Amino acid sequence: MKRRWKSAVAALAAIAAIGSLTGVTTYAADSVSITNVSYDPTRELYEQYNKIFQKHWKEKTGQDVDITQSHGGSGKQALEVANGLEADVVTLALEYDVDAIQDAGLIDDGWVDEFPEDSSPYTSTIVFLVRKGNPKNIKDWDDLVKKDVGVITPNPKTSGGARWNYLAAWAYAKDKYNGDEDKIKEFIGNLYKNVLVLDTGARGATTSF
């Protein structure tokens, strides 16, 4: 499958329905329960969105819907679902995390074409969170490679959002150095030399900060 990378500064949220939700599709039951398996930083988003969806669904069908949330590193969540974690919906950070679930035979081929925008309902801009008052005057990627700056970011090996962080840094360096790969790699190396903690997910990185 051709990879459809969005922007290097965007977080792909791929969405796929898993299994059969008879109650949802036929509206026969008074209530229905669904589980959304998602990546780390979306917890608060869905806590708010679920209330809107529950109201909408009640008005549309007369059904009450109970939504259970599961959160963690995107790759880890995909592996959990592939290995048996029951999910009705997955909202993950990377296309190939959903592909891993497809490869396990839990969703049909072609999921990426099922909804508009390659099944990417939203994007998330990368921002820098700094100490109060921004004492080191951090404004752009160049500031993160200064020797007196410590960086906290999730591990790209376990976190989908961290991979977008990595790609955003790469895109910045590619533009800055006109595609000179040696200089790009040097920039990325200097950035990760400043990383104090590589947590497994975005929530852990926020806690460490």
Where are these regions (language model features)?
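Early extracytoplasmic/lumenal segment of secretory-pathway proteins
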Residues: Y27-A104, E114-F115, T207
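Ligand-binding pocket segment of bilobal, Venus flytrap-like solute-binding proteins
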Residues: Y177-F209
